[in-house]
A protein has these predicted regions:
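N-terminal secretory signal peptides that target proteins for export/translocation
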Residues: 1-16
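N-terminal mature ectodomain segment of secretory-pathway/periplasmic proteins
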Residues: 41-123
């Protein structure tokens, strides 16, 4: 569009400027809205690529570090760090370990039996749970209150689960995790903000995952960093052999095996 010169003798007043400003704002809004839509689509494509890659692996062996932040009764933010390993053979075998400053725990699932091995307490418990690893994750969450934030990454419907209730998605840019270049994505829903760093290139491995709880005062975070990612698992990885010195007990009798020591946090106070 060709702009014509202004020849009016009167200075351009506020009333004349207002339509110009509104027009500029409208153009900017359309531009920013289009960029946001493109960003959202790009973020979803990258998550879908990661999901397809991860679910395509029939066996997995990964090592990880995790950080969980809690808020004390004095509104002090404290972080607890653990390390561990996850071995998976789809559809129904899982071994996971978590070692921190307060707990050393292992779970083993062979498709029929779940074993929770409390190395600190020198005891273990077993319950019959027939089904897939995904059904196991549901049983642990619904019946025993065990919630593993990073467990979403193991599900075959990981894309649908992670994108459920997402209201905003964006590609932030690039990042480097342990020397590996990654695509940095950010997502929002009503209760949490979460970020993920996915390895760039032919192997879109999730390298870092951060969940921020917006509904809790001080917005504590959970961070998962995947260190090693392999696709081979030893055949006997899902066979549990009890330490002869350990005592077998009922699962309900087992002491607290959470990675956060009892008495550290107050009840989650809503904003």
């Amino acid at each position: 569009m060709k702009l014509m010169p202004v020849t009016a003798k009167k200075p351009i007043g506020r009333a004349t400027k207002l339509p110009i400003l509104l027009g500029t704002a409208l153009i900017m809004g359309i531009s920013l809205g289009s960029q946001a839509g493109a960003q959202s689509n790009d973020a979803e494509k990258l998550i879908k690529g990661m999901a397809d890659y991860v679910t395509g692996q029939k066996t997995l062996s990964i090592t990880y570090d995790s950080d969980i932040e809690v808020i004390t009764s004095k509104l002090q933010k404290i972080q607890f760090t653990s390390s561990g390993q996850v071995q998976l053979s789809r559809p129904d075998k899982l071994r996971a370990t978590r070692t921190g400053g307060y707990r050393d725990v292992e779970i083993v699932f062979d498709g029929k039996m779940l074993t929770v091995n409390n190395k600190d307490g020198k005891d273990y418990a077993q319950i019959e749970v027939a089904g897939t690893t995904e059904e196991l994750i549901d049983v642990l969450r619904e019946n025993h209150g065990v919630v593993a934030p990073g467990a979403d990454l193991l599900l075959t419907n990981v894309f649908n689960v992670m994108m459920n209730d997402v209201v905003e998605a964006a590609v932030i840019g690039k990042g480097v995790i342990d020397g590996v270049e990654c695509d940095h994505l950010a997502f929002r829903n009503m209760e949490t903000d979460w970020q993920i760093w996915i390895e760039s290139g032919a192997n879109p491995i999730p390298r870092k995952y951060v969940i921020t709880s917006k509904g809790i005062a001080e917005a504590p975070q959970y961070t998962l960093r995947i260190k090693e990612w392999k696709t081979d698992v030893a055949p006997d990885a899902f066979t549990f052999k009890a330490d002869p010195s350990f005592k077998k007990i009922a699962l309900g009798e087992m002491s607290d095996i959470d990675e956060v020591p009892q008495g550290t946090t107050k009840a989650g106070e809503k904003k």
